[in-house]
């Protein structure tokens, strides 16, 4: 069996990756680091042989220092020398001109040799005086005897400074310093479409501000300045009419003139996708209900994937969505009719191979949203007789159902009721109230709510005949004024005692003191 040699990547691609991990092959490492046999020969051979003047491997193609010489001929007599640098004169710092000279009078050869002092006056100098010391000190006077020096006597002439006086003031010739003139330029460009401020104090240099000069006159009736009428710079520009036109032909807030409806072109490829128009509006809100049963835990904005076995024969709720395993998220665009179209791509799985792979065609499902019709306008009518209400002050509300009864407040047929029937019935609301008396720190007294009835003597029905005397004694009909419950309010201990009839019957007897 012949072995196939696989091609390896370029050395410049292998070297950066293998250098980090130190796993580079020897040939790639030597080639990239210039350590091959040829590189070693050039390194060691260049140490003993100098080939610098021949221009080998320089890549310039000039033939070394001497250049190329044609075969069978001689070198040209004209040689290219070095480039001569041209020296330009420098700009003088100051202007060059004739200096200022002091005029000098010509000397008369026949005149006197001694120049009179009036021609050139001499300044008068003050005699030299020694100033007093700043800090005077006390000096003791000593007498010093001067003795002549033995020998021949000699006289020392005394010479002082020559003083010349003149009554005229001194004249000094002062030569003014000459400086070269300076030129200061200022450029200013005005932009009529941009104003920075009313006044501009910009210095030298370019500026977009313009100076405005305001001239005010105090004599009334005079117009200062010039009136320049403005003209249209673009007379060919079309004029706009001031009338307002109501345009309702467009269906969007920012209509585009002459623009075609943008829709995905790949969806309408009939050779690739089957075009299926859906008429059920559930396709927009709940597309899953067209394929399988509803599941509330899903999101319509993502792709819908339906897991089903191809071998199982399951009918879809909608015939067009049979064998659909996936529906993409909705795409909104404009249809040919101008309505909004909602599109989804569906993948069918109606073919299953032996390897278990399910394949099938793809379909383009689209639904055109219908236009919204304008709302119907209903004319509102006034309720009741408006004219009669304005005149008589009554308003009658009538209903067509007949469930209401019309009642006139001015009709005297209404029955009159007595005042006694209108009086409220008195209700005894304080019948079962109990009075609880006690101090703040003591617990309230709980009294039994229901009083146990007690029997009178010879209770029953008795017939009394008038004018006859009864043989037996009858108790008085007037009830006893003794209360059943006696509460002593003045006693701080809040003690009480019950009526003997309220005491439960026991074997043990109670004694009251």
Swiss-Prot record:
InterPro entries in alphabetical order: Late_L2 (IPR000784)
GO biological process per UniProt: microtubule-dependent intracellular transport of viral material towards nucleus; symbiont entry into host cell; viral penetration into host nucleus
Region of interest: Disordered: 229-269
Annotated GO MF terms: DNA binding; structural molecule activity
GO CC list: host cell; host cell endosome; host cell Golgi apparatus; host cell nucleus; viral capsid
UniProt PTM comment: Highly phosphorylated.
Cystine pairs: 18-24
A Pfam family annotated for this UniProt entry: Late_protein_L2
Primary localization class, coarse: virion
Motif Nuclear localization signal: chain residues: 1-9, 504-509
Subcellular location field: Virion; Host nucleus; Host early endosome; Host Golgi apparatus
Biased composition (Polar residues): 249-258
Keyword field: Capsid protein, Cytoplasmic inwards viral transport, Disulfide bond, DNA-binding, Host endosome, Host Golgi apparatus, Host nucleus, Host-virus interaction, Late protein, Microtubular inwards viral transport, Phosphoprotein, Viral penetration into host nucleus, Virion, Virus entry into host cell
HAMAP family named in the record: PPV_L2
Function in brief: Minor protein of the capsid that localizes along the inner surface of the virion, within the central cavities beneath the L1 pentamers. Plays a role in capsid stabilization through interaction with the major capsid protein L1. Once the virion enters the host cell, L2 escorts the genomic DNA into the nucleus by promoting escape from the endosomal compartments and traffic through the host Golgi network.
Subunit structure: Interacts with major capsid protein L1. Interacts with E2; this interaction inhibits E2 transcriptional activity but not the DNA replication function E2. Interacts with host GADD45GIP1. Interacts with host HSPA8; this interaction is required for L2 nuclear translocation. Interacts with host importins KPNB2 and KPNB3. Forms a complex with importin alpha2-beta1 heterodimers via interaction with the importin alpha2 adapter. Interacts with host DYNLT1; this interaction is essential for virus intracellular transport during entry.
Stated family: Belongs to the papillomaviridae L2 protein family.
Identification of the protein by name: Minor capsid protein L2
Source organism of this protein record: Canine oral papillomavirus (strain Y62)
